[in-house]
Swiss-Prot record:
Keywords: Cell adhesion, Virulence. Induction: Expression is regulated by the hypoxia responsive morphology factor A (hrmA). One of its GO terms (biological process) is cell adhesion. Transmembrane segments: none annotated. InterPro entries: SANT/Myb. This is Subtelomeric hrmA-associated cluster protein AFUA_5G14865.
Length: 383
């Protein structure tokens, strides 16, 4: 148990109240959860107007009555109990005359306490002096950070929770960095001329992006924070279902792509000309060498002529002189074109009747002697 010996000085202006935190700026206790539990003071703010009208408290930060490290160790011990609102006192003054001034807080609906001070007596002025604490820390009465306040955390346990303004931000950031993410807290200070507020909030956990395949669980709201093991148990079956679904889609895509022809592949390939049916079926391979295009075309036309009942014009094949002479003699004999075709086919390669007629009408008809003239000569000779 530590006793506070406070020094009060008259001050004409309203003092500046600084935020108080229960933590050391450079070292945390062994159990940070105990520290955060004790710092969770929902009713730790009070109005100091009525007290300041009677006396002006001024406690130098270099008068370290009880160091913050000793306070942190005391609060982190197993014997420390969480504070109760009815035992929080903002002024416990042990002066040489044995007079005390105290007040009790009353809590509002918003969780902050505004205390009505009932001072018993005014405290006389006392000269500044140096006070030593149990932590063997003694300092002079020079302070650049201004006025610090003190507060009673337990029944009978007095402590000065005074941290300079320059160390308040460092210590609060250090608490948030060194503590685990589940137990991190933000100590927010709002200091005014008449009241002191210390607001402890629980920092929001870092939101991790859930995979898109996991459905939003809207029906489970009031069950509290989700445990990692519970979340893992829910994620594993959903991932397995996603893998199976992906495999099914892949197989469907493969089968669908094999049945259809992509336009890109069709455009990339050059346009091929259709080959004749007879030339495509090359079953008879002769020993005369590779077939040329003309030979393949001739064989294809011969096959088509043989299969079709109607006469089809042959490809241009010139008539020889012997063929022209035989054709002239057959025509001169006065045979029908069917007989001429048969006799001509017996001697030479087969020619169609139309081909023979065209050859006769274009070439041989002009050069052959007319039959009319010969008939007249014969008739005149007979006379």
């Amino acid at each position: 148990m530590h006793t506070l010996h406070l020094i009060f000085e008259p001050r004409p202006k309203a003092p500046r109240l600084h935020a108080l935190i229960v933590a050391d700026a450079f070292q945390l206790p062994a159990n940070p959860s105990r520290l955060l539990q004790t710092t969770k003071l929902e009713c730790l703010a009070a109005s100091m107007q009525r007290i300041l009208s009677h006396y002006q408290p001024r406690v130098r930060t270099n008068h370290s009555v009880l160091s913050s490290r000793a306070v942190a160790q005391h609060l982190g011990s197993d014997n420390a109990d969480p504070p109760r609102p009815e035992t929080i006192l903002y002024a416990q003054n042990h002066d040489p005359f044995g007079r005390k001034s105290s007040f009790l807080p009353r809590c509002a609906d918003n969780g902050l306490c505004h205390a009505d001070a009932n001072p018993v007596s005014e405290v006389p002025e006392s000269p500044p002096s140096t006070v030593k604490s149990s932590g063997d820390a003694s300092v002079s009465d020079k302070d650049d950070d201004g006025l610090m306040d003190r507060c009673m955390l337990h029944d009978g346990a007095k402590g000065l929770l005074a941290v300079p303004r320059s160390k308040v931000q460092t210590s609060s950031g250090q608490v948030a960095e060194t503590s685990p993410p589940q137990l991190s807290r933000k100590v927010i200070q709002n200091a005014t001329s008449s009241s002191l507020y210390i607001k402890v909030e629980r920092s929001k956990p870092s939101s991790r992006k859930r995979p898109s395949c996991i459905a939003l669980e809207t029906d489970e709201k009031a069950s509290g924070p989700r445990i990692r093991a519970r979340l893992g148990a829910k994620v594993q079956p959903s991932l397995g279902q996603v893998v199976e679904k992906f495999k099914r889609q892949a197989t469907q895509h493969d089968t669908g792509s094999s049945m259809c022809i992509k336009p890109e592949s069709a455009r990339s390939k050059p346009i091929r000309r259709k080959r004749p049916a007879g030339a495509a079926l090359e079953t008879d391979e002769k020993a005369s060498g590779p077939q040329t295009r003309a030979r393949a075309r001739a064989e294809a036309s011969e096959a088509s002529e043989a299969s079709s009942p109607l006469p089809i014009a042959r490809s241009a094949r010139p008539y020889s002189a012997a063929e022209d002479d035989i054709l002239q003699t057959l025509v001169a004999r006065g045979l029908a074109w069917e007989e001429i075709e048969k006799e001509f086919g017996l001697r030479f390669a087969k020619r169609t009747m139309r081909s023979l007629q065209m050859r006769w009408s274009r070439k041989l008809k002009l050069t052959a002697p007319s039959t009319r003239c010969s008939k007249r000569k014969r008739s005149s000779a007979s006379l």
